[in-house]
Amino acid sequence: MRGRDEDTGEFRGASRSQQRREALEIFDLGEKLVALTPAQLAKLPVPESLIQHIEESKRITSHIAHKRQLAFLAKHMRREDDETLAAIRDALDANSDTARREVAAIHRVERWRERLLADGDVALAELLEAYPAADRQQLRQLVRNAIHERAKNKPPRAYRELFQVLRDLSQEQGLESGDSGLEDGESALEDDE
């Protein structure tokens, strides 16, 4: 109950500004939920009643009607207990962290590919030293073909195949957690910023 306590004179409950901030946070959470794909949404601990409102919000495309439907979704979300909303927020944060790590791993593989194309045998020797299971002949041939394709302005078939081989190597042997393929002075944290 809001208002002043008759005995002590202190205010009860959250202030109106605090309630408004909490309502806006829930509205933003609703927008994030509506932006998710059905597969992503299925992984979250969202109650069935909210899923119906989320799907309804996705269906409406008119700007004002969509915003009104989001407000309606937020109203229903405010009726949920705090633990449910906290679980949804935590799951969304975990999903975004996972996506960020996957993107960082892809960037590291791309840096290895560019290093192999720029430095040739020196970078290849470093890669093979760190990951002896890699196929030297296949990698050398892909690097040579990718350089040739780039010089002749041909479609980058070998360039893409080199990326796929490096990505498979990273998934098998943990390339993303080992040597990142960075030049001296570069920071591995650049991907996380």
Curated annotation (Swiss-Prot):
Coarse class of the protein's main subcellular location: cytoplasm
GO molecular function: ribosome binding; rRNA binding
GO BP field: assembly of large subunit precursor of preribosome
Pfam families named among the record's database cross-references: DarP
Region span, Disordered: 1-20, 171-193
CC annotations in GO: cytosol
Subcellular localization(s) per the UniProt record: Cytoplasm
Classification via CDD domains: YjgA-like
UniProt entry keywords in alphabetical sequence: Cytoplasm, Ribosome biogenesis, RNA-binding, rRNA-binding
Listed Basic and acidic residues bias regions: 1-10
UniProt biased composition (Acidic residues): 181-193
Function: Member of a network of 50S ribosomal subunit biogenesis factors which assembles along the 30S-50S interface, preventing incorrect 23S rRNA structures from forming. Promotes peptidyl transferase center (PTC) maturation.
HAMAP family in the record: DarP
Protein family (similarity comment): Belongs to the DarP family.
Name of the protein in its database record: Dual-action ribosomal maturation protein DarP
Gene name of this polypeptide: darP
